[in-house]
Design a protein with these regions (language model features):
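Transmembrane helical elements of multi-pass membrane transporters/channels
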Residues: 18-37, 139, 173, 202-206, ...
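Small-residue-rich hydrophobic transmembrane alpha-helices
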Residues: 50-110, 147-166, 271-335, 369-383, ...
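Residue-level signal for short hydrophobic patches within transmembrane helices
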Residues: 9, 13-32, 36, 59-66, ...
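Helix-terminus/linker motif at the lipid-water interface of multi-pass membrane proteins
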Residues: 28, 32-50, 120-127, 183-190, ...
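Short runs within selected transmembrane alpha-helices of multi-pass transporters and secretion channels
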Residues: 71, 140-158, 166-174, 195-208, ...
Length: 450
């Protein structure tokens, strides 16, 4: 038995832990990679520049989610065929997805660059930070194809049970990004432009290395394949489109929430942006566990080992409980110090209050996000996308309705008060669908996805 096949042979808790831990560490470094801009800009340029970078986050997340959703469609099929040892079909999926999605990323990058000013103005970005925010965003879109390629390749690696290589690449690019941030922002005084340029260069180098390593890895699986297959692309899109819609719609919803926050002023936005970064750090731990569950489920389904799927789900829930407890303890004891990392000395009392209140509130309820992500991961791995999409729309509807209706009337706190309720509702809808969807027999991947 190949060492690559441990997701279908080892004990579920052991297999998921071994697989998920590099992904969790990778998520941490991904956020270090993202937070480096915010921390360094906040410390060396000021809270207004921090707000400019933070104002771009909701919009850039929409485009990132397109890349992540596209990766889900390819990743589910790669895992399924890998588990079934149909390596020719697996390599056809890989080639088809890289060609198709690279073209898509170029189109989206050009669109984003051309309409950066219009999009940021539409989000009611405060006038005193608008030009810096647009500058940061345009540099981001120049490098968008690199970001897209890296995310697709990272999903490919995890789909074949390899989570250590993406971790190594993330550590490398994170360190490079921080060094270049310090040089360009603190040393050369390039401000927001320097932070964006440092990120672009680090992403580009990481994407090229990822491609070279992945192509070398594919030589291990000798089997004839097609460079492009329209039927396989349609199979990918049947899974990818609901995932793109879900992730993009949620991010668009967060853009709307951003528009609700912006009128409260630059300092409130700075505090909100600081805690959004912190929420993303802990959220991506649970996202990583959910992302680990998907290839675990897909590989075992392809191998006909359906009895292992429910055991893997329970193992993921155990990991979620452990990390939720850690998140609570860290936030409860260090929330002020964490806020200071971003806001620096010129952060006002309002910025610190917004950041601290938001951070402590979500710290109590991360367990809801954990069980939601694990359940969603199983649904994705099984290819059951409609309930997955509906559940996430319910989550978004709760967050948006409370933010839009209550925050302008009763205060900014209502932006985050509904977050745990949305997570819990999402889990309940997803779990209701999952209870009726556990597979009970061997499923041939070629029969489902051809």
């Amino acid at each position: 038995m190949s060492k690559d096949e441990y997701l279908i042979t080892d004990a579920p808790l052991k297999a998921l832990t071994v697989f998920a831990m590099p992904m969790i560490l990778g998520s941490f470094f991904q956020q270090v990679y993202n937070m480096a801009d915010s921390i360094i800009v906040g410390q060396f340029v000021g809270s207004s520049a921090l707000a400019a970078v933070g104002a771009c986050a909701a919009l850039t997340n929409v485009f990132i989610c397109v890349a992540l959703g596209a990766g889900v469609g390819a990743g589910v099929l790669v895992s399924r065929y890998f588990g079934a040892k149909e390596y020719g079909k697996m390599k056809t999926i890989v080639s088809t997805s890289l060609i198709s999605f690279l073209l898509l990323s170029i189109i989206l990058g050009v669109f984003g660059f051309c309409f950066s000013h219009a999009m940021m103005s539409g989000l009611q970005t405060p006038a005193d930070i608008l030009e810096e925010a647009v500058l940061y965003l345009r540099v981001y879109f120049v490098g968008f194809p690199f970001l897209f390629m890296y995310n697709i390749l990272s999903t490919m690696f995890t789909s074949i049970g390899e989570s250590k290589i993406p971790l190594g690449l993330l550590i490398f690019s994170s360190i490079l990004n921080i060094v270049m941030d310090l040089w360009m922002v603190a040393g050369l005084g390039l401000g927001v432009f320097g932070a964006a340029l440092a990120t672009l260069i680090a992403q580009g180098i990481s994407a090229v290395f990822s491609l070279l390593i992945f192509l070398y890895r594919m030589r291990r699986y000798q089997s004839p394949f097609q460079w492009f297959d329209g039927r396989k692309l349609r199979s990918m899109l049947r899974i990818a489109v609901p995932s793109v819609l879900q992730q993009s719609t949620v991010s668009i919803g967060m853009m709307i929430v951003q528009a609700v926050v912006n009128p409260f002023g630059t300092q409130a936005l700075a505090g909100y942006s600081a805690t959004m970064r912190v929420e993303n750090v802990f959220s991506l731990i649970f996202v990583s566990i959910g992302n680990a569950v998907s290839p675990y489920v897909s590989q075992n389904l392809g191998a006909g080992k359906t009895e292992r799927i429910k055991k893997g789900y329970h193992a993921a829930l155990v990991l979620d409980v452990c990390f939720a407890a850690v998140a609570f303890l860290v936030i409860e004891t260090l929330h002020t110090q964490i806020s200071a990392l971003f806001l620096g000395k010129d952060g006002t009392a309002l910025a610190y209050q917004v950041s601290g209140d938001y951070m402590r509130w979500i710290g109590y309820f991360f367990i809801f996000m954990g069980i939601k992500m694990a359940t969603d991961g199983v649904l994705r791995g099984l290819g059951i996308m409609r309930p997955f999409l509906i559940a996430n729309m319910v989550n978004l509807a709760i967050r948006l309705s409370v933010a839009l209706i209550c925050a302008p009337r009763f205060g900014i706190a209502f932006v985050w008060l509904a977050v745990p309720a949305g997570w819990l509702a999402n889990f309940l809808v997803s779990y209701a669908a999952l209870r009726n969807s556990w597979p009970g027999e061997k499923v041939e991947p070629s029969r489902i996805f051809s």
